[in-house]
Amino acid sequence: MADLSLLQEDLPEDADGLDVDDYSSESDVIIIPSALDFVSQDEMLTPLGRLDKYAASENVFNRQMVARSLLDTLREVCDDERDCIAVLERISRLADDSEPTVRAELMEQVPHIALFCQENRPSIPYAFSKYLLPIVVRYLADQNNQVRKTSQAALLALLEQELIERFDVETKVCPVLIDLTAPDSNDDVKTEAVAIMCKMAPMVGKDITERLILPRFCEMCCDCRMFHVRKVCAANFGDICSVVGQQATEEMLLPRFFQLCSDNVWGVRKACAECFMAVSCATCQEIRRTKLSALFINLISDPSRWVRQAAFQSLGPFISTFANPSSSGQCFKDESKSSEDSSAEDKDRMRDNDVVEEEHRRPEDAPSDLSAPHSSARLESLEGCAAKTPGHSAGDVPAPVDSSLLCTLSSESPQEAASNDENGRKPDTNSKSASRPDAGTSSPEATPLDQDMFNSFHFWRTPLPKIDLDKELQQDPEERLSPERTGDVPAAPLPGPPNITMATRKELEEMIENLEPHMDDPDVKAQVDVLSAALRASSLDAHEETGGVEQRSELQDEVCVSELPDCNISHDTCVPLISAAEENAEATPDYVHGGADVSPGDGFSPDEDRRPKVQDVVPQALLDQYLSMTDPSRAQTVDTEIAKHCAYSLPGVALTLGRQNWHCLRETYETLASDMQWKVRRTLAFSIHELAVILGDQLTAADLVPIFNGFLKDLDEVRIGVLKHLHDFLKLLHIDKRREYLYQLQEFLVTDNSRNWRFRAELAEQLILLLELYSPRDVYDYLRPIALNLCADKVSSVRWISYKLVSEMVKKLHTATPPTFGVDLINELVENFGRCPKWSGRQAFVFVCQTVIEDDCLPMDQFAVHLMPHLLTLANDRVPNVRVLLAKTLRQTLLEKEYFLASASCHQEAVEQTIMALQMDRDSDVKYFASIHPSSTKLSEDAMSTASSTY
């Protein structure tokens, strides 16, 4: 406030002492007094007086300055409660200013004033609620757009900082917003109010959102007059769903979402496509699979290119929502125990889901002969639908069953089986889990039954809350399980939705007929392909209902049947069954992947490439659309960067499908890896280590390593992706495969642009991590030359990281047996750097010694023998920079060690003599650092001042 008088104050013309005619008659010198020679009237006013004076000024700029200085005025009078209240009352009057710029300036200061009031609440209780919040709420409906925007930003800032009480939100904020969204409200105000309601929902919580915001939000989604309102609702739909939860989403929001997805304005449909993943996360798996999938297919086939573009960008994230959220990693269980013990462990795991998280193991530890893993979703239904009764043999070979069949084919009745499947419990407490004995062995007491061929333990499907029994399940058990009928059971689940009505099939046929005349358009052709696939899937379901098992067997690509109970299934089959050899009782871990089943030990047959790209984790139509993103026609008709979006989401899709379905994605991944756009390849390079974790060591070695090798020879923009995660990828490989890359590490020193020093800095960072993966001999033979090369880099930032690399290398080689590699490395450091003809090399030697001391890479007695004599000889170096750094190292690092503080050895005496010599150095900086031990000055803070750098 003190500077307000200097801004726009009109001084009277006849002010005392300002007459320009005053002069000294003796010297004839005109004296022009300055305004600073006199006491300003403002300096005589109190803070409240100055506030009142300029708040009433006719000058708009003065009133703006009053609004801007309100916080300073409050700080001046904060000790007096009455003055604080007086300032707040002036704020209320200033809020009625007719000038929009003054009101906007005032609103910008409200969050700061509110925070001050919160901190000084004892002095001015309820100040914000009584004086400031009404202004914010009132400005939400201001006629001026700038004032409204400022008040909206202020309201969100206040909510984010939790400065508004919950009671005030319910009684003052929400009612105003609801009024602003009334049908007779201004169009612009209504649109902005809806946006505020959506943005504040995550801040106010589920209760207030459901009671006060959700009903009006649903109404706004159906606003038939203003598409801007519907567009705002669609853009924020995912946020509302995540706040209110699954039940409210499915009951109230999903019908509105379906309407918005079919809106006649493409901008609304595009907004729906962009938030599709968030909406999917708030629904159950059944709705996601049966309803949202079909809805998303419509968006992908939308007539508007912008809608299709947004839909394809969201396709990968939407597919990832089909992943099993309870166990997305790998876990193992010991198969050496009896089936009874395994059953007990399954019960414990069902009661405590934390066991899965506590038993994570790296994928590279998985042996090659692991049994086929199963998803946790199937574990939940295992207790009721896959248990065997006592006396049944666990050594029988199961035959594949269709995914439309109910999960249980045990000796219990179909009604009991369905009940147990829903409840997730075992029908018999004495029943055993499905555990296979050694190949070729069987229990002498147990008699193999045909039911074991159809054991659903080996097959995965999403558990549904209510399942209608198929006709074949309601048949007589003996007829259903007769050996003559086993060969008719299909080998793989069929794609497409499981239950499609006749009316739906009729609609699909009509849509295909309407689109056939426009088959020249690639987009229309793609839509017809999708609809045809859905129609075929519905036809398959119709055949299942009417034709029974015999007709469905003709629709399968391959059928894997075991007609005899004690026979083994051939490894050439394309259906991932669990054979007896892979289910032996050895003490090997059984991996369970979080997405779904994993084929045995990741061992895929040579015919795998010819396997149909069919799976049952996600709707097949969605996967087909995702795989089509690499089609060149998509880049022309949808988005030129569609391949980049496909590459970006591929790890999430792979995790969802699981490694047993990698054959569906392999060709797409190879296509992306050879894409002409380097941005696509760069995206894959940055995520290849994550994909390796998902696929496991065998698939990584077979499919990812060749692509990884190609990335190593690509552009620098692509190479940096694999370099940043080089350690993460190599640690997943077998030791022999990992050693092959030792010969290629040297290639990272060569870049397309020599000025790309960050590339070499990242290489040094990765080499530090790679030290743990290789033997001391490999480190000495291959990593040592690279590290010494980086220590002599032209850029100081690269050298700084390299000093750390060399010190860690010294530590590893010194602790190795025998320690000859460490001694040889130290001798090479002395020869190449300690006696280097260039002063920068000798300075680098001091830096390395300092890092070795700080990180305790060598015992002090070993350091004193191998490095310290050569370090002390640099006290006579002709370059002051080297001597300055030596003085810092001796004073601030070496003498800090207990070895030199407690012992009176000859080494300590040599150090003290060197320091005394440096204290008498002719350079003032050397004497300074050698004479004192400044506590506030550390080598890490000022060593760069003495380092030579190109940049």
From Swiss-Prot:
It comes from Mus musculus (Mouse). Pfam families: HEAT. Regulatory subunit of serine/threonine-protein phosphatase 4. May play a role in regulation of cell division in renal glomeruli. The PPP4C-PPP4R1 PP4 complex may play a role in dephosphorylation and regulation of HDAC3. Plays a role in the inhibition of TNF-induced NF-kappa-B activation by regulating the dephosphorylation of TRAF2. The modification Phosphoserine is found at S936. This is Serine/threonine-protein phosphatase 4 regulatory subunit 1. HEAT repeats lie at residues 26-63, 65-81, 82-119, 127-164, 168-206, 208-246, 248-285, 287-324, 506-543, 699-735, 800-838, 862-899. Residues 332-365, 474-487 have a biased composition (Basic and acidic residues). PANTHER family: SERINE/THREONINE-PROTEIN PHOSPHATASE PP2A 65 KDA REGULATORY SUBUNIT, SERINE_THREONINE-PROTEIN PHOSPHATASE 4 REGULATORY SUBUNIT 1. It comes from the Eukaryota.
